[in-house]
Amino acid sequence: IRPANVYGPCSNPWTIRPIKLINSGQMILINKGIGLCNYVYIDNLIDATLSATKRDQSVGQVYLVSDGAAVMWKEFFGYYAQMARKPSIRSAPQWLAKVIGLGMEITSRFTGKPPKFTREAARFLTCQARFNIEKARHELGYQPRFSLQEGMKLTEQWLREAGYLPKEK
């Protein structure tokens, strides 16, 4: 199973880290967030994984797994901005993001600490690729149970319960 960007409860890279960056005002979109985000809600990934374990023909096969759609990063991270009650997320051009990434990569060589942002991250966040999950649909019977809207609603509930967002009154 090769999952897209896994979001939902306990996902550090695609849930916890973005909400922390948005809450602190440090989140920045690249090129206005028009790159494509391929995503999968954690429960959808679990469904696909369990389905693969039940089929002998899946042994040795590669299955791309996502929620079956891609959205621009500005929409994906926009859900988190709404949850955090932040009106918008700032943007920087790709060339600037790459320069910043290079600077952080060089600095990390001297500090021994991993860079917080890299040129590869800048490329990733501006990519226009889409996951094709037809093989998983056909061979595993995979069908995402949760849409992005449903997954984000459940994620918001978890973020509030876990203390990453204030509890609603």
Per-region residue spans from a language model:
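Conserved beta-loop-beta element that borders a ligand/cofactor-binding pocket
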Residues: 1-9
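Glycine-rich Rossmann NAD(P)(H)-binding loop
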Residues: 8, 30-35, 63-70, 81-84, ...
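Substrate-positioning beta->alpha
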Residues: 11-17, 31-53, 60-64
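A short C-terminal helix-loop "cap" of Rossmann-like NAD(P)-dependent dehydrogenase/epimerase domains
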Residues: 19-30, 113-116, 134
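Residue-level signal for the nucleotide or nucleotide-sugar donor/cofactor binding architecture
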Residues: 37-43, 71, 131, 146
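Mid/C-terminal beta-alpha module of Rossmann-like enzyme folds, strongest
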Residues: 51-116, 133, 149, 153-156, ...
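Active-site loop of classical SDR/Rossmann-like NAD(P)-dependent oxidoreductases
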Residues: 117-133
